[in-house]
Amino acid sequence: MSLVIMARTRLTTGGFAEPVVADTAKSLSKQGHRVILLAWDRTGKNETTTTTEWGTIWRYQEECALNNAALFARKLPGFLSWSTWQILAFQKIEKDIVLHYHDLDTLMGGVFTSKLAELPLIYDCHENYPGLVKGAVSSIVAKLLHKLEAKLLSHCDGIISAGPANYARLDGMLEQGGKAPFAATEEEAFKVMALPQRDFLNTKLTRIGNIKRLDNYPLRRIENKEKNKTFRLLYIGVLERHPSRGILETIMTVSKMKGIQLDIGGFGTLVPTIKKLQEKSKNVNYMGPIHPDNVALKTIESDAVLMALDPSNINNRLSAPNKLFEAMAASVPIITCKELLMGQLVEREEIG
């Protein structure tokens, strides 16, 4: 079996892999592959290496704020160079290596390393990255990123998309290159959702849905959970201003209500503001960063999950975020915006 070497520019609480990355690694490990994740520890405070149930995390330790696009752009080449050197070192002792690079910010390094080392490259595209950063960077830069991504796709041996809208976008880019639309339409996304699974097999571009492991969401625990004394609304995730997830607006609203508690978990530049607002409100509870292994239990214990993404951001509007599937797995309704593709799905399926 192969040694799969992943690259990712971010980690979550405690320096661990995000759920979607960890789930992919677990699946590969169960198939008999060995997995190494080369990840950028942007706190610069965690251990250099950690062994997990699915493989090993190797961390590039360099401080870099999550919301500072200019600083990130300056420091990104350092991470990509470090990743390349690690892979070249592994190649001296391993014969069967597959590269698995996550999102556009790593892809240029992935293509370079793939060509240099003559190794197959899988591009795991979690989101419309140019659409995500549009607003944090200028429209011109976002369009250049779109064209860059389209050019790099031709150098990938395989491409993975989780969401239907992103699949439709990538499919268009493979056909039209940089002239393809910046984003797919809602109609195109729903067409992809209706496609049979066999259409995603044995093709360069495939769709692997953001499915949760149900053993983390035991049915007996869900069916027997005790009713909360107050309605508990839960948000666990990144706490940043851009793109907005409606956290501050929700705090303002909930603080004026009775019979409800807002539980917030995560890390980011909004934490100091959230702590100040918490002091003024009895029904806002900031829990601090939540370990990925505890997210399922927190979700089961809640009465609803909040995922109010800003619809003005094109990536938000057409995404199928991780929180949607966590809420579904826990049999908990999700509160979101009807303008989102996710909102239309929630309304259609009556799950929030």
Specify the residue positions occupied by each region the protein language model found.
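Glycosyltransferase donor-sugar binding loop
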Residues: 236-240, 261-274, 288
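N-terminal subdomain of nucleotide-sugar transferases
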Residues: 1-45, 49, 158, 175, ...
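Membrane-proximal helix-turn-helix segments that form the acceptor-binding/catalytic region
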Residues: 23-26, 80, 84-91, 108, ...
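A short, active-site helix/loop in glycosyltransferases that binds the activated sugar's phosphate group
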Residues: 142, 146, 150-204, 344-348
